Amino acid sequence: AIRRARRKGRRVVVPTPVVAQVHRGGWDRASMDRTLKAVDTFLETSLDTAMHAGVLLGRTDLTHAVDAIVVAEASNSLTTILTSDPDDIGRLVEADGAGRGVYVEAV
């Protein structure tokens, strides 16, 4: 999915908590390194973004803070979120205000 986005000329941006979520061991290190090298920008999570994510979790009764951080980071731009959990991400996007230019794509 990241390679496809790159071929389409899209920037690949990843909030740093996502790396913690996927970096749990038991994975192919070379594959992880290739994936991380394909990322254009890693976003540090600000206090405002973390608080926005908390509000989204409260609105949805979901518990995955990393998902909420991804949506909070995306909320101010025309963005496609690539995710293996489109249901929860979709709920968070809706809670943030439908039609704001954030799209969810399952991978």
Where are these regions (language model features)?
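Acidic catalytic patch
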Residues: 39-60, 86
